[in-house]
Design a protein with these regions (language model features):
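Nucleotidyltransferase catalytic core that binds NTPs
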Residues: 1-160
Length: 160
């Protein structure tokens, strides 16, 4: 598994990617990564998990008492064991936090070579987080980025 760290542009592209913290790499995360790998395989592209070295809440709400379940190294190890080709560890900065979802999607395409974005069934991103899956699909169509919704993982009592 290749690991890229920092907010640097990648010269090589062609990824099917998903994005999230993946703290704990729980069954829902594992299910999402399974979908990611299937989509990447069907499209003949490499799979990529985009995550953050530190939790975005530390930038959004500095001074809060936020505890992580796993270290970055533990998350990377488990994600690698799940068969992901590449992990991109972004730095979550105030500038990144200020991006609207469409601009963030454009950045993923231009700077990281993402061609398809696999979204968790209830995942939202962008500075306002006021958009829904259909909005991301519309942005993707405008930008030339395919957006796919992963299947919902049903835990014993509720979706995960």
């Amino acid at each position: 598994m290749e690991i890229f760290q920092g907010n640097n542009q990648l010269k090589e592209g062609g990824f099917v990617a998903t994005i999230g913290m993946f703290d704990g790499v729980h069954l829902g995360h594992q299910f999402l990564i399974e979908d990611l790998r299937k989509v990447a395989s069907s499209e003949g592209l490499r799979s990529a998990v985009i995550t953050f070295g530190d939790h975005p809440q530390r930038v959004l709400r500095p001074g809060g008492d936020l505890r992580m379940i796993m270290t970055l190294e533990e998350r990377l190890r488990i994600i690698g064991e799940l068969g992901v080709d590449t992990v991109i560890v972004m730095d979550f900065t105030p500038e990144l936090a200020a991006l609207e979802s469409r601009e963030f999607m454009k950045l993923l395409m231009q700077d990281y070579g993402v061609r398809t974005l696999v979204m968790g069934f209830n995942h939202r991103f962008g500075c306002n987080k006021d958009e829904y899956f259909e909005d991301y699909v519309t942005h993707g169509e405008e930008l030339g980025l395919k957006v796919v919704r992963a299947r919902e993982y049903q835990g014993e009592y509720s979706p995960v």
